[in-house]
UniProtKB/Swiss-Prot annotation:
The keyword Plastid applies. GO terms for biological process: translation. Belongs to the universal ribosomal protein uS3 family. Keywords: Chloroplast, Plastid, Ribonucleoprotein, Ribosomal protein, RNA-binding, rRNA-binding. This is Small ribosomal subunit protein uS3c. Transmembrane segments: none annotated. It comes from Barbarea verna (Land cress). It comes from the Eukaryota. One of its GO terms (molecular function) is rRNA binding. Part of the 30S ribosomal subunit.
Length: 218
């Protein structure tokens, strides 16, 4: 059997960069890691509760966290930031207060910035959310996959592979279905590949969605 390494970790330092930028003493490292998870969960929960697009997408591509002794800087990369910035100062301030309360950080300043990504459907996380929304609405998985590929073609990517695993269309036996368009060179370290694995709960059970997008060659 072929062993598949995570494409993002495989390319760290060449075409991929870390989403958390900070240093810690070895004993304090686990605390910093837990803090990062709390921040990301808190932001995602807030966005889920307060924002609803028709398809039920959050539109968060990634959350970058930079920490200094007296400051935590959070950058949220979103595909559709209008949803969070309709009444911008109030929403962002409310989100900042929520995160601060969750972390209970009194002696550190917390900044939140929101950045729009130019091609939302060129990002695997947003695409996975789109497919998940379609599957929840009982759209056939093939139709959902093809629609996702159409959207990425508009985003100017060089190749995409989509895989869905589980009880597809409510069938008794779980199986894996996949579709590929263009080139997806997973073995080439210089190839910039974005990857995402996403879990969606449907009425038939849990489905796993994996997406590989070949963006460009370094």
């Amino acid at each position: 059997m072929g062993q598949k390494i995570n494409p993002l970790g495989f390319r760290l330092g060449t075409t991929q960069s870390h989403h958390s930028l900070w240093f810690a003493q070895p004993k304090k490292y686990s605390e910093g890691l837990e803090e990062d998870k709390k921040i990301r969960d808190c932001i995602k929960n807030y966005v889920q509760k307060n924002i609803r697009i028709s398809s039920g997408m959050e539109g968060i591509a990634r959350i970058e966290i930079q920490k200094r002794i007296d400051l935590i800087q959070i950058i949220i990369y979103m595909g559709f930031p209008k949803l969070l910035i309709e009444d911008k100062p109030r929403r962002v301030e409310e989100l900042r207060m929520n995160v601060q309360k969750e972390l209970n950080c009194v002696n550190r300043k917390l900044n939140i910035a929101i950045t729009r990504i130019s091609n939302p459907y060129g990002d695997p996380n947003i695409l996975a959310e789109f497919i998940a929304g379609q599957l929840k609405n009982r759209v056939s998985f093939r139709k959902a996959m093809k629609k996702a590929i159409e959207l990425t073609e508009q985003a100017n990517t060089k190749g995409i592979q989509v895989q869905i695993a589980g009880r597809i269309d409510g069938k008794e036996i779980a199986r894996v279905e996949w579709i590929r368009e263009g080139r997806v060179p997973l073995q080439t370290i210089e190839a910039k590949i974005d990857y995402c694995s996403y879990t969606v709960r449907t009425i038939y059970g849990v489905l796993g969605i994996k997406i590989w997008i070949f963006v460009d060659e370094a």
